[in-house]
Swiss-Prot record:
Its main location: nucleus. One of its GO terms (molecular function) is zinc ion binding. Testis specific. The gene is ZNF331. This is Zinc finger protein 331.
Amino acid sequence: MAQGLVTFADVAIDFSQEEWACLNSAQRDLYWDVMLENYSNLVSLDLESAYENKSLPTEKNIHEIRASKRNSDRRSKSLGRNWICEGTLERPQRSRGRYVNQMIINYVKRPATREGTPPRTHQRHHKENSFECKDCGKAFSRGYQLSQHQKIHTGEKPYECKECKKAFRWGNQLTQHQKIHTGEKPYECKDCGKAFRWGSSLVIHKRIHTGEKPYECKDCGKAFRRGDELTQHQRFHTGEKDYECKDCGKTFSRVYKLIQHKRIHSGEKPYECKDCGKAFICGSSLIQHKRIHTGEKPYECQECGKAFTRVNYLTQHQKIHTGEKPHECKECGKAFRWGSSLVKHERIHTGEKPYKCTECGKAFNCGYHLTQHERIHTGETPYKCKECGKAFIYGSSLVKHERIHTGVKPYGCTECGKSFSHGHQLTQHQKTHSGAKSYECKECGKACNHLNHLREHQRIHNS
């Protein structure tokens, strides 16, 4: 007998019941293909070994190996059956000046306990999370998971796209990325016709139509369509933020957010719009920006029919109908529909203005205001009126301008029924009914109900 047996379990990948249930048929087929490739690699080993043994595989053994592989390759697509591997691979044996292998694999078919039960190639007895990363202490239940995780620390990205030279840590990421260049979207939703590059994206998308939210938080009961959304949400309860920026110390709950954040320091904007040349830190921002040019608004409110360019805009809008304001300020008790609004509001109390203009040094309490301000320096006016061609720095300015052409006056006075195209015009008008005069002259104390009236009055003193 040869010493130091290499069992098939050393290269096999096992799935738990829960993990297997999450795989679609294409992913399960991929699993079988990978496992069979491993079988083939083991059979065809021709490596040097310190072990010498004169026993050779017989022709009958080799025939059994090849026949078994062909048989399993043909029949493994049946997910209603389980296949187990019995036998071991001995280390390469030396004989007649070359190295050969001795391996007998017998596939045994047995009925599955239920449809979709994961194949168990070998029952392992590792303790849960027994593979620990020496860099950050994070633990994993399987060795291959640790190997994949360590690439985050080393920065290793061995899989490079030939089209754009972008590199990836894992081969499946490259495969998915390449569909961007080919434009391939083979997975189509039967309800709305929207197509996707990946089957998993279609499964998640279908939950929009069905309303299914299978991932529920045990702490607060909130449910989510996707597992990663639940994982991210749970970090709000635990306060866990594993990924820290070495430049500024800011921490993040997800690694991709850290990667995007680092581009703020480096100035890198790899995603460029082909229509106007504007570049972005992340790809999702480019996709959303393109809708300015196309006019696409794919997210529609079922209550009022209003459509939006982003799904988070729709989610925020829907709170108007429900009246939900779950985010409350601990300082003053003011409540907000959205968490981001609360964060911005809290800066009023703290005086924090973290967003600084590199041109003039002016600081702002939210990034959106800085983005708008920077257009003053660049002269960029991305919002153009289709009627007259006039362009604006801000989208809100375009919306107000378009009312000149449409004649829309959405702000109506409840006292007299008079309508206005702008909210501030209604506010000023309502002072006529209330008698409020909020603009007072510092010279003589006279009060006016409109700011422009006060300015006209002040000319008397200046003259």
